């Protein structure tokens, strides 16, 4: 595809970062680099990139910094949560800041072995970039029938640098949830400081037969950051996966969730909340393949867009030819908080089977004046009335969080991004 005017410069820099550790790179990383260079960067003329600005990123001078932080710095950014925590700083695992995993129910190994990793469901240029530049792979396994008592928390801390340079950090994780196992995994992304940086993330998850996954993503990076993520879920028969993403920070944040339902009677729930403010862009994308019959999926994606922010949603459900009795629903609800706020939404269905029940829908609206009037008549001021309505709009997603402490921390982050909140 035709690239951006400065596409070749960005590609050359990423190639240079790759070659700096070339001797350590796996053959699979080499292949992803070659695919990246062949593909090039997209432009706004490419349909899937029409609303995602890349110019502010690709004209940067990229560096890869191996920063060190103290336990106090980690704790200042951490969630208050009883968990097994693994800490990654600037793309690298830091054992000294992480919890021991022995006896936790999670088997963790960190290396550059990529031979057993699943192929990408929907590959694109930034997926290839992360696969090529990630320093290592975090291999996580939960054995058959195991149910770890605590959630696994993957904490990612990326620092920005002063001046024109942009620190780029890439994180690669893989989880194997064996037959009958149950686990909760939380991805937490934060910035060490207020300078801009570029985060790439890739997480692949195999959910075996009768296994149950709870996945939560918290993207809480700073307002100058760029964040491009690709999560793949593969479900076997009778498997269940619930994925909740709270995309609450970043100049440009693009999150892809691609899923294959590869066994009968599997159940999937994908929820997301995006809240772009000021001039931020948040682009949420889902790709779901119903490859076997008798599966059930529900998706609920909500955005609250303030100021001159832009939210993008693109979701597709594909029902294969023999996937009978499929039940798939996808909903995208959007709330505009400013006259210049924008939403672009494109839910899609591709159905190649008979005897299925599928639907999609999207709504775009503003706060109802009658609701405001009602609350004002009860003595509630304008700003508090707005915030009450917004919290109610988001509640369908936040209430899905089982841990009350975690829920309150997500609500606090939402509050920071509301009109009148501290940003």
Task: Kindly give the residue locations of the regions a language model identified.
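Short, low-to-moderate order helix/coil transition modules at the start of elongated helical scaffolds
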Residues: 1-202, 209-212
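Conserved beta-strand/loop scaffold segments within soluble protein domains that form the structured core
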Residues: 116-380, 394-397, 401-423
């Amino acid at each position: 595809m035709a690239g951006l005017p400065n596409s070749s410069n960005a590609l050359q820099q990423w190639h240079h970062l790759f070659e700096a550790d070339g001797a350590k790179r796996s053959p699979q990383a080499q292949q992803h680099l070659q695919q990246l260079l062949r593909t090039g960067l997209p432009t706004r003329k490419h349909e899937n990139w029409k609303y995602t600005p890349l110019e502010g990123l690709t004209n940067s001078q990229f560096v890869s910094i191996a920063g060190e932080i103290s336990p106090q710095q980690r704790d200042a950014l951490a969630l208050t949560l009883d968990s097994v925590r693994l800490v990654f700083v600037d793309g690298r695992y830091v054992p000294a800041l992480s919890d021991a995993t022995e006896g936790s129910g999670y088997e963790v190994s960190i290396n550059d072995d990529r031979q057993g990793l699943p192929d990408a469901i929907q590959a694109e240029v930034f997926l290839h970039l992360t696969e090529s530049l990630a320093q290592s792979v975090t291999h996580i396994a939960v054995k058959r029938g195991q149910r770890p008592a605590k959630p696994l928390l993957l904490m990612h801390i990326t620092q920005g640098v002063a001046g024109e340079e942009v620190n780029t950090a890439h994180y690669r994780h893989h989880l194997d949830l064996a037959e009958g196992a149950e686990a909760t995994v939380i991805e937490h992304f934060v910035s060490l400081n207020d300078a801009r940086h570029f985060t790439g993330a890739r997480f692949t998850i195999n959910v075996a037969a009768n296994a149950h996954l709870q996945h939560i993503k918290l993207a809480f990076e700073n307002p100058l950051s760029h964040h491009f993520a690709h999560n793949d879920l593969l479900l076997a028969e009778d498997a269940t996966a619930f994925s909740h993403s709270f995309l609450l920070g970043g100049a440009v944040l693009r999150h892809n969730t691609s899923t294959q339902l590869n066994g009968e009677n599997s159940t999937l729930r994908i929820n997301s909340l995006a809240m772009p403010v000021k001039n931020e862009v948040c682009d949420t994308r889902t790709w779901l393949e119903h490859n076997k019959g008798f599966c059930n999926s529900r998706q609920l994606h909500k955005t609250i867009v303030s100021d001159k922010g832009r939210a993008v949603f693109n979701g597709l459900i594909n029902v294969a030819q023999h996937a009978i009795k499929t039940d798939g629903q996808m909903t995208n609800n959007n709330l505009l908080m400013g006259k210049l706020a924008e939403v672009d939404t494109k839910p899609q269905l591709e159905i190649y089977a008979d005897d299925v029940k599928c639907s999609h829908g999207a709504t775009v609206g503003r706060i109802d004046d009658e609701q405001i009037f009602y609350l004002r008549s009860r003595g509630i001021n304008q700003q508090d009335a707005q915030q009450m309505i917004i919290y109610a709009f988001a509640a369908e997603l936040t209430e899905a969080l089982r841990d009350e402490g975690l829920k309150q921390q997500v609500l606090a982050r939402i509050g920071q991004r509301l009109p009148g909140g501290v940003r």
